């Protein structure tokens, strides 16, 4: 569960390293976001000479959360960190690679491009 002020790692090769959630999209009173939800982030750390700079604001999709997610078969899946992938205006990923595993719930949220770029889908 991601809420405002939550720090996340950026799991793509755009050059950003750490981001902070500044808004959970999908309703004026919405407080939490889970895997597959779109949030607005601000880049807090970035590597030099990258396409994203510190202080830039983007939309991102959540690909990993530390809070467990219950699946229909009764199993739970959770990850070691909270991570997101930066999106462009068309809600497709800005980067060409996705680092680390991503959750299968992204398939249900219609982020097939992110799933295909990921090295491992759990």
UniProtKB/Swiss-Prot annotation:
Pfam families in UniProt: Ribosomal_L14 (PF00238)
MF annotations from Gene Ontology: large ribosomal subunit rRNA binding; structural constituent of ribosome
The UniProt record lists the keyword Ribosomal protein: yes
InterPro entries found in the cross-reference section: Ribosomal_uL14, Ribosomal_uL14_bac-type, Ribosomal_uL14_CS, Ribosomal_uL14_sf
CDD domains tied to this protein: Ribosomal_uL14 (cd00337)
One Gene Ontology biological process: translation
Cellular component aspect of the GO annotation: cytosolic large ribosomal subunit
Annotated Gene3D superfamilies: Ribosomal protein L14
Keywords: Ribonucleoprotein, Ribosomal protein, RNA-binding, rRNA-binding
Known role: Binds to 23S rRNA. Forms part of two intersubunit bridges in the 70S ribosome.
Subunit comment: Part of the 50S ribosomal subunit. Forms a cluster with proteins L3 and L19. In the 70S ribosome, L14 and L19 interact and together make contacts with the 16S rRNA in bridges B5 and B8.
Assigned protein family: Belongs to the universal ribosomal protein uL14 family.
PANTHER family documented for this protein: 50S/60S RIBOSOMAL PROTEIN L14/L23, LARGE RIBOSOMAL SUBUNIT PROTEIN UL14M
Stated name of the protein: Large ribosomal subunit protein uL14
Native source species: Borreliella burgdorferi (strain ATCC 35210 / DSM 4680 / CIP 102532 / B31) (Borrelia burgdorferi)
């Amino acid at each position: 569960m991601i809420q405002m002020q939550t720090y996340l790692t950026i799991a793509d090769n755009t050059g950003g390293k750490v981001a902070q959630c500044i808004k959970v999209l999908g309703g004026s009173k919405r407080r939490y976001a889970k895997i597959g939800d779109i949030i607005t982030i601000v880049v807090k750390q970035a590597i030099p000479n990258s396409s994203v700079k510190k202080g830039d604001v983007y939309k991102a999709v959540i690909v990993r959360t530390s809070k467990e997610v219950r699946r229909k078969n009764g199993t739970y899946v959770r990850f070691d960190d909270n991570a997101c992938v930066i999106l462009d205006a068309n809600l497709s990923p800005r980067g060409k690679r996705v680092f680390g595993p991503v959750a299968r719930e992204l398939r249900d949220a219609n982020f097939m491009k992110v799933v295909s770029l990921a090295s491992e889908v759990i």
